Amino acid sequence: MNPYILTPDLNGEGLHIGIVRARFNEEIGQAQLQACLEELGKLGVDERDVMVVSVPGALELGVALARMAESYEFDALIALGAVIRGETYHFEVVSNESAAAISRIALETGIPVANGVLTVDTDEQAQARAAGKGADCAQVAVEMANLAAALEPEEDDEDEDDEDEDFDDEEDDGR
């Protein structure tokens, strides 16, 4: 057996990336954003092809991400922010609902969304993870944008029965 294997592609040239950053826990979000933008540049994404918007908090990420995804102007999106545990149940609500919204947007629109919302117990944990998570999200966005493009069905106007692009060379005899 010789399967067709798509390898990770971290070439960001020509990609359009949208970033939505939650302003709550501003210092953490800024560190994430800076690391994310630096990594996107290293991966070849032109700064003119990146749009950054900010929203008040993690629960508002979904609305902005949905609007950006629905515009189909972006190859991938990135959500950045931090939810730090407090003394109430609010932490669980914000963590769960923001993660669910991010996943739902990606699945419903087919636009990859890298989830960079940190969910941590302390400010120190968030600070320690912020830059790394921002850079990771840049890599995830580029890789998933390229994967989504590679998996996009090609329109073949000339011959719908052309099987040159099939993964296996065996003819289907209808059985």
UniProtKB/Swiss-Prot annotation:
It holds the Pfam family DMRL_synthase. GO terms for cellular component: cytosol; riboflavin synthase complex. InterPro entries: LS, LS/RS, LS/RS_sf. One of its GO terms (molecular function) is 6,7-dimethyl-8-ribityllumazine synthase activity. (2S)-2-hydroxy-3-oxobutyl phosphate binds at E87, T88, R129. GO terms for biological process: riboflavin biosynthetic process. Residues 152-175 have a biased composition (Acidic residues). Coiled coil: none annotated. Belongs to the DMRL synthase family. This is 6,7-dimethyl-8-ribityllumazine synthase. It comes from Bordetella parapertussis (strain 12822 / ATCC BAA-587 / NCTC 13253).
